Amino acid sequence: KIFYYIPPKVWIWGEKRVEKLRLADYIMVIFPWEVDFYKKHNISAIYFGNPFTDFYKKVERTGNKILLLPGSRRQEIKAMLPVFEEIINDLKEDKFILKLNSTQDLKYTENFKKYDNVEIIIDKKLKDIVSDCKLSVATSGTITLELALLGLPSIVVYKTTFINYLIGKYILKIGYISLPNLVLNDEIFPELIQKDCEAKNIEKHMKKILENLPEIEEKIENMRKKVEGKAVVESYADFLVKEGK
């Protein structure tokens, strides 16, 4: 038997690719809308929930810092750090945490040494940082789902080259780019892309988030319910053992 756990995101990149997945006996997916997508193509999909919900639980937040997440790719980091620096310079009364993925990324942060309202962190786990924060600004990626599951209101940002943006806009067939918004099919986190991704606009959305926290936190909770399962990783493993005999 052929089991395909977490298949390619054909619902993003084009439905033609779905034909190759018919070779599998079981398609095991981790997002609720994928079940309906495959059903439309007469393919049965197995869904027990998203495995991230086993590991990311809502964190009690007592701090007042703003978490900045520039991404992991060099291009993302170099695009976002100047924007983050402008925000740090504008909001001198706020305290910031700049979370990097690697010590190799420190070479891009020389300009940040002159600011006393920002702390650069590399090794600390995200869930241990979130408790110290009131919101985050995060480069689009799976980290946006982690932030939502941890309960931290966020702004999703992304900058790329104009050509890559045009190609992505042409290929992508979905309305949102961040996973929390896709799950709920609603805007939980504002998405500021390309020309919208500039400091003053981000600052405006920060203010708006803090003024509407109860509504945003309710949406975050509704999103969690959509992807939550009971012992998700164990459920997929049990299914593999049972059906793989």
Which stretches of residues belong to each language-model region?
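C-terminal alpha-helical cap of glycosyltransferases
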Residues: E228-K245
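Active-site and donor-binding regions of nucleotide-sugar-utilizing enzymes
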Residues: K1-E60, L69-L81, D90, N101-D105, ...
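Nucleotide-activated donor-binding/catalytic signature segment of Leloir-type glycosyltransferases, i.e.
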Residues: T109-K124
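Conserved donor-nucleotide binding/catalytic region of nucleotide-linked donor-dependent transferases
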Residues: K195-M223
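Catalytic binding pocket for nucleotide-activated donors in carbohydrate/polymer assembly enzymes
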Residues: L149-K200
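A donor-sugar binding/catalytic signature common to diverse glycosyltransferases
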Residues: D25, D123-I171
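Charged active-site motifs of nucleotide-sugar-dependent glycosyltransferases
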Residues: R61-L67, K95
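Generic beta-sheet signal
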Residues: Y5, I30, F48, K99, ...
